[in-house]
Amino acid sequence: MHFNNKNKSLDCLNTKIWPSPAKINLFLSVTGIRKDGYHFIQTLFQFLNYGDYLIFNTTSDKKIKLINKIHGIRNENNLIIRAAKSLKDFMWKNKNHDTPGVKIFIKKYIPIGGGLGGGSSNAATTLIALNEHWKCKLSLNTLADLGLQIGIDIPVFIYGKSAFAEGIGEKLSLFQPKEKFYLIVIPPIKISTKLIFNKFILNKKSYLKSCNQYLKKPLKNDFEPMIRKNFIIIDNLINYLSKFSNFRLTGTGSCIFSEFDSECKAKEILYKLPNKIKGFVSKGTNISYLKEILKIRSNFNVLS
């Protein structure tokens, strides 16, 4: 779903409904691999005005329920459930035993296994929304710490600002790239980040650079050669689309994207996609729609 303040399907002041925006990695460089398998990276996150939305209804039975299951993901592995349980456990350990339950509904638009951060974004939205619904009154830093225990990418969604990430992705520095239009192309496959990390062989370590140093050269993704070699459909798509623009991988895929100065130009290429290949055009934004909604609701005093 495309987000904007005029969107009638997402009422800005309806505190039961919360946006969960997608992200892209404008570049991704692998600078090393730890003994435990985690990768040292440098990457630049930017948000899209596109994503899922979640609906939260508190209950008196203290149970956490996801009303509609996400196909292919078991509840115990679902980051929404894990985030809600993490917050509830934190409140319990801090002597708050009156935290109610919740029923959660998700409307899914972000493709699963696409490298757009859907699961991490869903978890971040859950932590922020339940922090309000359950009147936990925790700081963003505390929520980010809880999120980091679940997934490396979750803190950037908690803070809601574009950022240059280092370390294993947990060290964030605010950075504001240009807000361009992006054509996101969705191949009909899912790619497991964990699987790619396990298979990735670091043949040549990228040197540590500043974000500005990366932006002076053509942007790239160190996982892309491996992905293109192992997933021929992505290789074929990038080769085909290279006639129109320079496309590259976001995250560990499967989605690829290219940036444009105008929405019209991006849509022009969208209409040239091969049959059965989906895509969408979205504006990049340095402030996530979730953060915008949080600010609007605070200004109108509709939050707890």
Swiss-Prot record:
InterPro entries: GHMP_kinase_C_dom (IPR013750), GHMP_kinase_C_sf (IPR036554), GHMP_kinase_N_dom (IPR006204), IspE (IPR004424), Ribosomal_Su5_D2-typ_SF (IPR020568), Ribsml_uS5_D2-typ_fold_subgr (IPR014721). Its EC number is 2.7.1.148. The keyword ATP-binding applies. It comes from the Bacteria. One of its GO terms (molecular function) is 4-(cytidine 5'-diphospho)-2-C-methyl-D-erythritol kinase activity. Pfam families: GHMP_kinases_C (PF08544), GHMP_kinases_N (PF00288). It is an enzyme of class 2 (transferase). Pathway: Isoprenoid biosynthesis; isopentenyl diphosphate biosynthesis via DXP pathway; isopentenyl diphosphate from 1-deoxy-D-xylulose 5-phosphate: step 3/6. ATP binds at P111, I112, G113, G114, G115, L116, G117, G118, G119, S120, S121. SUPFAM superfamilies: GHMP Kinase, C-terminal domain (SSF55060), Ribosomal protein S5 domain 2-like (SSF54211). The active site is at K23, D153. One of its GO terms (biological process) is isopentenyl diphosphate biosynthetic process, methylerythritol 4-phosphate pathway. It catalyses: 4-CDP-2-C-methyl-D-erythritol + ATP = 4-CDP-2-C-methyl-D-erythritol 2-phosphate + ADP + H(+). Keywords: ATP-binding, Isoprene biosynthesis, Kinase, Nucleotide-binding, Transferase. Belongs to the GHMP kinase family. IspE subfamily. Catalyzes the phosphorylation of the position 2 hydroxy group of 4-diphosphocytidyl-2C-methyl-D-erythritol. Homodimer. This is 4-diphosphocytidyl-2-C-methyl-D-erythritol kinase. The lineage of its organism: Bacteria, Pseudomonadati, Pseudomonadota, Gammaproteobacteria, Enterobacterales. The gene is ispE.
